[in-house]
C-alpha cells in the first residue's frame, strides 16, 4: 500500500514520464533498446520485492511512450506485465514468495538451503526474463515494421491513437527537479532490496 502510494506520488510529479521520454529521445532510431532495459528493471523489481500490482501506474505511462516510439499499446503491456511477471517467477530474495516459502519449510522442520534457493531463483529469473524479452521484442519489431501486423482491432487502434497519440505529442522537459526525484526513487528501491 505504501509502495503503491509512493509510486503514484512519483508518477504525479511527471519525473518518470519525463525520464522515459528523455531515454526514448536519446534512443531515436534505436527505440527497440528501451524494451529490454525496462523489462530487466521491472524483472529485478519482481525478483527482489515482488513488484506486481505496483506496476499499474506504468501501463498508461508506457503506453504513451511506446505509441510515440512507433509501437502499439500491446508492447507496453508486454513490457510491464512480462517484465515484472518473469521477475516474480524467478524470485531470488522476494519476501512475499521466497521468504514465506522458507519460513513455511522451517515451520514444518525442514531447514532450506538458502544458496540453492538463490541459485535456482537466479536461473529461473534469467531464463524467464530472457524468453519474455525475446517474445516482446519479436512482436515489437513486427509492429514497428508494419502497423497492420498488430493484434489490436481497428477500433482498438483508433482508440490507441486518439488516447495516446495526443499524449505522446506533448513533450515534457527533463528538469533537474525530475532528476533529483528519480535519484530519490532509485535510492528507495536500493534500500528496499
For each feature predicted by the language model, list its residue ranges:
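Core transmembrane alpha-helical segments of multi-pass membrane transporters/permeases
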Residues: 1-17
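Transmembrane helix-loop junctions in multi-pass membrane proteins
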Residues: 11-16, 45-54, 97, 193
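Hydrophobic alpha-helical segments of integral membrane proteins
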Residues: 16-27, 101, 105
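Hydrophobic transmembrane alpha-helices that form the pore/transport pathway of multi-pass ion
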Residues: 23-89
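Membrane-embedded alpha-helical segments of transport systems
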Residues: 45, 81-94, 120-134
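Transmembrane alpha-helical segments and their short flanking loops
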Residues: 88-119
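Long, contiguous bundles of hydrophobic transmembrane helices that form the permeation core
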Residues: 115-193
Amino acid at each position: 500500500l505504501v509502495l503503491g502510494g509512493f509510486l503514484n506520488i512519483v508518477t504525479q510529479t511527471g519525473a518518470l514520464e519525463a525520464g522515459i521520454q528523455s531515454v526514448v529521445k536519446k534512443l531515436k532510431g534505436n527505440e527497440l533498446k528501451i524494451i529490454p532495459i525496462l523489462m530487466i528493471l521491472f524483472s529485478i523489481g519482481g525478483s527482489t520485492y515482488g513488484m506486481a500490482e505496483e506496476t499499474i501506474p506504468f501501463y498508461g505511462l508506457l503506453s504513451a511512450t511506446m505509441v510515440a516510439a512507433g509501437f502499439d499499446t500491446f508492447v507496453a503491456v508486454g513490457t510491464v506485465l512480462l517484465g515484472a511477471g518473469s521477475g516474480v517467477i524467478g524470485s531470488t530474495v522476494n519476501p512475499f514468495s521466497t521468504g514465506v516459502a522458507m519460513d513455511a519449510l522451517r515451520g514444518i522442520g525442514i531447514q532450506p538451503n538458502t544458496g540453492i534457493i538463490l541459485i535456482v531463483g537466479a536461473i529461473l529469473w534469467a531464463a524467464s526474463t530472457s524468453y519474455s524479452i525475446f517474445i516482446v521484442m519479436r512482436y515489437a519489431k513486427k509492429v514497428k515494421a508494419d502497423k497492420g501486423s498488430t493484434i489490436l482491432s481497428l477500433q482498438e487502434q483508433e482508440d490507441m491513437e486518439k488516447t495516446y497519440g495526443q499524449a505522446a505529442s506533448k513533450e515534457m522537459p527533463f528538469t533537474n527537479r525530475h532528476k533529483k526525484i528519480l535519484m530519490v526513487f532509485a535510492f528507495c528501491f536500493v534500500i528496499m532490496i
